Regions:
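Non-catalytic, well-ordered alpha-helical segments in soluble enzyme domains
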Residues: 53-54
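Functional-site microenvironments in short loops/helix caps that host divalent-cation chemistry
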Residues: 4, 8-10, 14-16, 20, ...
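Short, structured beta-strand segments at or near domain termini in extracellular proteins/domains
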Residues: 272-282
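A short N-terminal beta-strand-loop micro-motif at the entrance of redox/enzyme domains
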Residues: 27-35
């Protein structure tokens, strides 16, 4: 874990590149106390240790199905895609048997992906792991402070240039979403957790690769009333915050692979592009 000293920073953005409906602004000052944050997302290997120690069953395992990106379906799951596509988001399919052990559905596995971020985990699953590990999920403010890596009001953990010196610095969709991915950044799906260079705080893949669960309930109007010191989000809600974007993000569809971008999902949801990392209090 990396120790972050906290302090005051400017959270949010008011630029024309964001999504007003997500409530990315207004920019406001936040003050955080010090905390420790995992340098990487929780890996398949780490989650496997948790499951072996506790016998925990994820929500996807209990439900018997989960969501898989259409381009990643295992051969057996691909046969079901016509009847399982999500209306309005046809690149997602509801697949029976898709779990953290079989992320793309029956026939897929994680045997060569122990160092990849665990996916197909819900907010509740992430909370269970964090409690077992003696940690917790980061607040949205802690996450953004960490992602910025000490930079002030920059779009990415390294600055404002998406590809500085022509080099890819994160795992996002390259090509024409959702049908053509050139893999110019070296990856088609999730990348190992220490891919690309760490940010100024020694944290890896804070943007791109997989979305990351945060503690907070999601409210697009929250920044207008959020307290200055150690905010923890609204008291109630229907969806939990997720941050960072994923390998499925593209400028034409989901320009949320930024330090200030916000999104959300229901706490029982699990997908092939959603993971988490943990915080420990100082």
């Amino acid at each position: 874990m990396q120790r972050l000293e906290g302090g005051e920073f400017l959270m949010g953005n008011e630029g024309d590149y964001g999504f007003p409906a997500d409530g990315e602004g207004p920019v406001h000052a936040v003050v955080l106390t010090p905390f420790y944050l995992d340098a990487t997302c929780v890996t398949n290997e780490q989650f496997n240790a948790f499951v072996n120690a506790t016998g925990y069953k994820t929500e996807a395992e209990r439900f018997g199905w989960s969501f898989v990106f259409v381009g990643h379906l295992s051969p057996s799951a691909a046969r079901e895609r016509a009847r399982s596509r999500v209306v309005g988001s046809e690149w997602w399919c509801r697949i029976d048997g898709a779990t953290w052990r079989h992320p793309e559905g029956p026939g897929s596995n994680i045997k060569k992906r122990w160092g990849h971020p665990v996916v197909q985990v819900s907010w509740s699953d992430a909370m269970a792991y964090a409690a077992w590990a003696g940690k917790r999920l980061p607040t949205e403010a802690e996450w953004e402070f960490a992602a910025r890596g000490g930079l002030v009001q920059k779009r990415f953990p390294w600055g404002d240039d998406l590809e500085p010196e022509g080099r890819h610095r994160m795992n996002v969709w390259q090509g024409v979403f959702p049908n053509v991915n050139t893999e110019a950044d070296g990856h088609y799906g999730p990348a190992p957790v220490k891919s690309y260079r760490a940010n100024g705080y020694g944290l890896y893949n804070m943007t791109g690769n997989v979305w990351e669960w945060c503690w907070d309930w999601f409210d697009p109007g929250w920044y207008r009333t959020s307290p200055r010191d150690d905010p923890t989000g609204p008291d109630r809600g229907e969806r939990r915050v997720m941050r960072g974007g994923s390998y499925l993000c593209h400028a034409s569809y989901c320009n949320r692979y930024r330090t200030d971008a916000r999104s959300s999902n229901t706490p029982d949801s699990a997908t092939t592009n959603l993971g988490f990392r943990c915080v420990r209090d100082v």
